[in-house]
Amino acid sequence: MSKIKVLFSTANDSKVLYPHLYGPNGTSEAKNSQESNDYLTDAVFQYLKNDDQFEVYECPWMVHMYEDSPSKKEDLTGYGFTLRKQVNGTPNLLSVDEAIQRIQAKEFDYVVMDSRTVNPWWNQRGLSPFFDNTVKILQTVLSCYPAEKILFFDGEDQITVIGGLVGKVTYFKRELQFDHPLIHPIGYCFPEWKFRDASPEEKTKDMATVIPGDKSTYLFTDENSYYEDYRTSRFGLTWKKLGWDCFRHHEILFSSCVPVFPDIKDCHPLTMTHYPKELCAEILDCGVVLDGYYKHQQYHDLYCFNNVRVDFSKISREYYADLLGRLKDHALKHLTSKKMVEYILSKTN
């Protein structure tokens, strides 16, 4: 059986490919600025590279995804935990001209593009150095492939969409807040092989170390310690960032930790549709989260919560075990990379 050929034409402000962006004369603030990697694109890419059914091509190189690449973990979003610097093997790299020729020959079953690469907003700020090539590739793809063969991931924090592409691609929107027959809701996903199981008896403390927005609690620079902290904690704090979906929500679940999500009831029904929002609301209502927490603005529309506390004695151990079991079951049934890829492909029929 022949493999499914997929071209990823997605790019970011890679420090390896575009070092001129960084430093005192670059458009990024400083040399220690992290790359703006997209979690959704990277999670799907990682899964397809690990599944023998797919033959994955790249234009440009997804350099930050490969274990033996020159990318440095400290330069990547979230130190590269879970997704980046973890793919083995040789990349199938194509030049822009080669990619265009193969697209014109219709060699690919699917072409993946994303808003991080296509959206002029990034280019206008000097953070999309592949943009001119992207325009050429996108024009070729649109002229050669039907919408069901073009997978477009809009992982922007804003609720707006690129209207000119709707109907011309299979459009997936992360922060979706309006119903449209040609736009599909989507959220982040997590590699199933990274799931860490834990029983209630293995928990050693009530609350995980990280408090979102409090940089003094961002202590972890290695993946194992970070996830073990969640795995051995009964609860983990999380809430909306600039957009509703946030990889931290998933890190908590896939570490067998119960998320305390104070603003979950404000999330739009079409946003985070795969996430267990009802269970998160149940956690707020069961009595374990104490009254007195409050929201404060950090800047623009980014906010945090203060004084979020739990009292484990307010619920029974049996209820906690049942709740944790339901959350883990939901995560493995709906939020793995495999399940998200199946969902994506189901929308191309």
PLM regions: where:
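Nucleotide-sugar donor-binding catalytic core of glycosyltransferases
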Residues: 2-321, 325-347
